[in-house]
Amino acid sequence: MRDRRPAFRRTALACAWLFSSAAFAAASPDAQPEAPEADLAIHAQPATQWTGVWTRQNLLGDIGGLRPWLGKYGVTFSLQETSEYLANLRGGLKRGGTYDGLTTAAVTVDTQKAFGLPGGTFNASALQIHGRNLSQYNLGTLNTASGIEAQDTTRLWELWYQQSFLDQRVDVKIGQQSLDQEFIVSQYAATFVNTMFGWPALPSYDLPNGGPAYPLSALGVRVRGRITPSLTALAGVFDGDPLGNNPNNLSGTNFNLHNGTLFIGELQYALNQPADGQMDMGPSNALPGTYKIGVWYHNGRFADQQTDNTGLSLANPASSGVARAHHGDYSFYAVADQMVWRPDPTGAKSLGVFARVMAAPGDRNLVSVAANAGVVLKAPFEGRDNDSVGLALTYVKIGSHARALDEDFASFTDGPYGVRTSETTLEATYQYQVTPWWQLQADAQYTFNAGAGQNPSDPTQPLRNTFVVGLRTNITF
């Protein structure tokens, strides 16, 4: 980048300000973990903070000495922006494009440096969400096109304190937390833009208000323990509804404990990765991977997707209209991230694959099965060590009772009625690292059987398959 002419530098810098962004999930303080999971993204990290605008890690550098001064007292401040323009070229609800944006600010305090308490971390973060959601207005798909889509607002995101014990083998986090920062995470899947490669479709549609995941969070306690150098266990107890008693809780400050309880547990196995405290023996031909299994349980009451409280179909004109209630809901899941090829153990080029699958009861849930899988190539071209190119598929299956209800409506109305079955989205993406602080991402998504076979605006009509293209830009300030 040093060979660029000044005019080009000025132009590129102006573009950066116009299209600024940074992947919000990647900046979570949870990425400093005591857990053994490796960063399979293998991003190159310089040993020093260079001062040149094109080579430093943050656009604003040390902000005139402010960052290092705060760092002496254990305070880390981050500001990031994600901006994107996505357009639907065919099918769905209508053609056209929309702009979406997300600003994330976070403050982390290391209590050892701040006031001498070892092993403590305090975190507070906030979101400013702006723009218009393509999926809601143009697509009508279940696999929503962008992981930053949400209602426009400025809100508190996370507010928690974490304390480690036993030489960092155990840590406890308490406070307002977003589960998608630690649970059900696939690092390779995070390369992609579609929402379902982040927080999956199944909890998004089956838990109250989508569960405590971006842009929401919930009060709770999470415990993490390193059982062996390669095996880590996580368990958490959280409020069951992140919006609580106030569905218009746009500020994120309605701290609620009155809407059921969500329990979640996960085991993580790290393959071919040095654990904390172990000596790094240098480059190895062994290929790293991470494997996870987990379960969540919610003790609230969940409406049957087909039957009312008298045993009739909800589509029956004689139905009471009150769905039969089920006590509790649950899901099992598995996640795998595995590097499968790396020609040079000292180089950046590598090929990784991922898979994630979840299942839940079909009687009380709109989505009974959700899965995604894909492949990611790091450093695809010579001299592009921090670029990534990926191809992935995400799949949603409608629960048996929701599907049966559609069939009942078709029978009782004696006319056309879309029966929802499943929906699949194929995504291809390329991340181009312009500078350490600026990334451009070109993206294309094609959705098969959009809306799972039903138009959400008119259930008697189907949706045509959608084709979405767009550009996302990420900036770390």
Q: What residue spans do the PLM features occupy?
A:
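Short loop/turn motifs that connect adjacent beta-strands in outer-membrane beta-barrel proteins
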Residues: 61-77, 110-122, 166-169, 230, ...
